[in-house]
């Protein structure tokens, strides 16, 4: 019998790579050989760290996306990138698979992340079974499915900015316009940069429709999204999350927890020592992920709000966000007396620190799962893609946070920032309920990945299928 060998094909963005690597580690722990492949540029950066920390059983390979020296979002065209990654990626991915076969290690199953439907086409051509690794919530996949299957006209009405507009989709909560993925709201299409997104999601669903038994592995867990996981009858949605290092889920991470956290940045900052000096549940942590750049005006409003609440904070402002000298925050001296600003931090280490009181977040799915798994309530500031849906779930379904309201210019003002942070932090009834709910979801997340937990059982069943197909 051939040794089971999974090829994991990952879109080259930090938010895709992190959960994919955790997935790879889980497969390896269950005795599956894994080859992790992403773009040449991302592979080069990973390889430096992987040389010393990659777990045994994980192989790294690269495919070309046509931008082997890196994609520069402020210069390069996103639509051209998606065209290049398809054409170059398809050919070079075939080469990776054929080379592996020539070496006596044939790929027996292919798993790919979203935005890469062409990877499934390559697998089909080479008669290799494939599965999609969906790294957003099941709720978001359901919304896209409904959009392309009977609800498109109704959802297009959401762009009218009518505050009373809402839609009830099967097995999902009542959704307003602000709760839909941004690519479905036509007002967001004025930015032509991401016009490739919706057709790519449609192609992804068409690809699944063309399979006899489409499998979608979802970075969620049954207790968190029980109804959304059952919403699409013709797809087999399988909750296998949260895909974060097990050492942060109350378990032992036998495969080097340092590998697969934050591959593209490291910091020698003393922020952890600083957190150690702070009282329990006192820190406001502010971070907006690896892609989002805030306007100077928005940063000023956040700074003003932080100064007004007079609470210690840890704020991540990435190096590429740094302004010219004349554009730096006007109240920097006051800020530095009250809190700490860093270019990067290990988010899971921060979220699990006893001093953490709340997380002001863009609500990317990785950050959302990390906050739930750490039991930290959220002040939600969503911007685009799935973040509005995630904020809806945080505020109204899981009840672990509050969503900030933007003004007519799309800016959250300092008074609103102050109001929302105080709801979570001031010890009142609402904040207390959020804390209790956050603790509840923390325990449920840990239970899901323990032996006999829903995600562990689901992943074992998938591994059994992979092994049988050899």
Swiss-Prot record:
It catalyses: 2-cis-(+)-abscisate + UDP-alpha-D-glucose = beta-D-glucopyranosyl cis-(+)-abscisate + UDP; (indol-3-yl)acetate + UDP-alpha-D-glucose = 1-O-(indol-3-ylacetyl)-beta-D-glucose + UDP. An anthocyanidin binds at residue 16. Its main location: cytoplasm. One of its GO terms (cellular component) is cytoplasm. It comes from the Eukaryota. PANTHER family: GLUCOSYL/GLUCURONOSYL TRANSFERASES, UDP-GLYCOSYLTRANSFERASE 75B1. Belongs to the UDP-glycosyltransferase family. This is UDP-glycosyltransferase 75C1. It comes from Solanum lycopersicum. The gene is UGT75C1.
């Amino acid at each position: 019998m051939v040794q089971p060998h999974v090829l994991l094909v990952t879109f080259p963005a930090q938010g895709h790579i992190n959960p994919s690597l955790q997935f790879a580690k889980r497969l390896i722990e269950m005795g599956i050989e894994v080859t992790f492949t992403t773009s040449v540029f991302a592979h080069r950066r990973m390889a430096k760290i992987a040389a010393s920390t990659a777990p045994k059983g994980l192989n790294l390979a690269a495919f070309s996306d046509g931008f082997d020296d890196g994609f520069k979002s402020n210069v390069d065209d996103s639509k051209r990138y998606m065209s290049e990654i398809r054409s170059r990626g398809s050919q070079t991915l075939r080469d990776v698979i054929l080379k592996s076969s020539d070496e006596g290690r044939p790929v027996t199953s292919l798993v790919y992340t979203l935005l890469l439907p062409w990877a499934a086409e390559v697998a089909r051509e080479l008669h290799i079974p494939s599965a999609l690794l969906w790294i957003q919530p099941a709720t978001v996949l359901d919304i896209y499915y409904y959009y392309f299957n009977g609800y498109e006209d109704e959802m297009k009405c959401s762009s009218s900015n009518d505050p009373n507009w809402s839609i009830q989709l099967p097995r999902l909560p009542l959704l307003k316009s602000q709760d839909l993925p941004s690519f479905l709201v036509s007002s967001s299409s004025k930015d032509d940069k991401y016009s490739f997104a919706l057709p790519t999601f449609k192609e992804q669903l068409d690809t699944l429709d063309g399979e006899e038994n489409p499998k979608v592995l979802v970075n969620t867990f049954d207790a968190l999204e029980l109804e959304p996981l059952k919403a699409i009858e013709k797809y087999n949605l399988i909750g296998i999350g949260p895909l974060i290092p097990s050492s942060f889920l109350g378990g032992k991470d036998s495969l080097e927890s340092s590998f697969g956290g934050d591959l593209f940045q490291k910091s020698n900052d003393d922020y952890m020592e600083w957190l150690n000096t702070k009282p329990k549940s006192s820190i406001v942590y502010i971070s907006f992920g690896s892609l989002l750049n805030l306007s100077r005006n928005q940063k000023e409003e956040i700074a003003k709000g932080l100064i007004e609440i007079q609470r210690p904070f840890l704020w991540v402002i990435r190096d590429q966000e740094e302004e010219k000298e004349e554009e730096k925050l006007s109240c920097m001296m006051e800020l530095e007396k009250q809190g700490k600003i860093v270019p990067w931090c290990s988010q899971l280490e921060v979220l699990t620190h006893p001093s953490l009181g709340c997380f002001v977040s863009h609500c990317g799915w990785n950050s959302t799962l990390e906050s739930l798994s750490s039991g930290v309530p959220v002040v939600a500031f969503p911007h685009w893609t799935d973040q509005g849906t995630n904020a809806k779930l945080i505020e109204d379904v899981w009840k672990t946070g509050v969503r900030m309201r933007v003004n007519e210019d799309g800016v959250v003002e300092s008074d609103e920032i102050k109001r929302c942070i105080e709801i979570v932090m001031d010890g009142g009834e609402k904040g207390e309920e959020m804390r209790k709910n956050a603790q509840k979801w923390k325990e449920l997340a840990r239970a899901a990945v323990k032996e006999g937990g829903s995600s562990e059982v689901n992943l074992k069943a998938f591994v059994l299928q992979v092994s049988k197909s050899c």
